[in-house]
Amino acid sequence: MNYKNREQYKHLMRVLAVAAIVLLECAVFSVFWDRYYASHLWLEPFWDKGNQIIVVIYGIFLLVFMYIYGGMKIGYMKGSSIIYSQMMTAFCANALMYLQIILLWRHLPYILPMVGMTLVDFALAGIVSWLFEKTFARLFPPREVLLIYGEYPMESLELKMNQRPDKYIVAHKVSVEVGEKELCRQIDAYGQEGVILGDLHSELRNRLLKYCYAKEIRVYLTPKLSDIMVRKAEALHIFDTPLLLARNSGLSFDQRFCKRLLDLLVSTILLVITSPIMLIAALCIKLYDHGPVFFKQKRLTIGGKEFYVYKFRSMIVDAEKDGVARLATKNDSRITPVGKVIRATRIDELPQLLNIFKGDMSVVGPRPERPEIAKEYEESIPEFAYRLKVKAGLTGYAQIYGKYNTTAYDKLKLDLMYIESLSLIHI
């Protein structure tokens, strides 16, 4: 199978996977709608076409949120990321449909059927995504790629690429020291399935990129910060020379308004849903050592503004009584047994829903850093302050796509990718 046909077949498989998930979830919604909601409308019950239109609207919601959260990238993203995206899609679509049902009823609709439907959607999306992931792995073998690196060895990147053996195999690697002519020869010999351009100087990287473009060879780049900053630049055609406009002004008023509205809605719903879990966590912390339940600490949010972030206490009392700020390590002796559980399950983060409700934080955004730790990062990476163009978040790209040992520089890149991708449909 040549590479162009392979991509066409992969695209077809993605379309089939998305269609299967949407049709299954629409079928589930149709059953729940007919059984629990359709007969309780304050108007006369819909005719068949009316019920069909409601199901179609639900399907459109699924497609929109699937696009926003990346749920269509089956066979491309990690299986866990796809399942997370599908779960977010089902949650948002079902929440929106529940609000729509409220408008159609005389009183507040039953929420338990909607919760049950959401759980069924989670299971269906997870199973279908897993099945298609396995099918992708069987039908499309991994690409054998050529890694070109600069003055710094790329063992870390090579290791990460090899952690996805279903997608990539670094079959050959070469340093830029061999010269541009030899690099082009190596691309012709070993890079027909793909070339990875590591941390190269811009001039050489651009020439190699043009060479691969002319040869129709797929290229993977480790982006520079400037690459990320112009991702959403606006093309201007005001005369015969093309211009790109990078506004660099943060969120617009309508983006801030919509993001704040969504934060209020999500934080309110989650505070209600998770209140029993938070009560149990608070009792466990108090009973263990009789110390304070909550822990607050200064963090930074938009514009460098300081605020107190709230968490359930997971460490011993006075864990930093010497006044020295230290990041928690993997097997930190200061973490209590209760703390290990609530950290592993992220329950310790739930009080930050109050920060979101107050407006200090957002649901999605760069994680808030302590002022002293942020200062340390900025000494070696001055651009680290760019993360403060938006509110700090409960979760963000660095948490979703990163790992415990992801470098501060890579976390910065991930956070900037989120900031530069913000729009009215991606907030």
What are these regions (language model features)?
Residues 4, 8, 71-75, 79, ...:
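Juxtamembrane loop-helix boundary motifs flanking transmembrane segments in multi-pass membrane proteins
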Residues 226-227, 233, 294-334, 395-411:
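Short, glycine-rich, amphipathic interfacial segments at transmembrane boundaries or analogous
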Residues 255-318, 355, 424:
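A hydrophobic, helix-centered structural microdomain
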Residues 329-391:
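A short, structured surface patch at a secondary-structure boundary
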Residues 358, 372, 383-425:
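C-terminal terminal-structure detector
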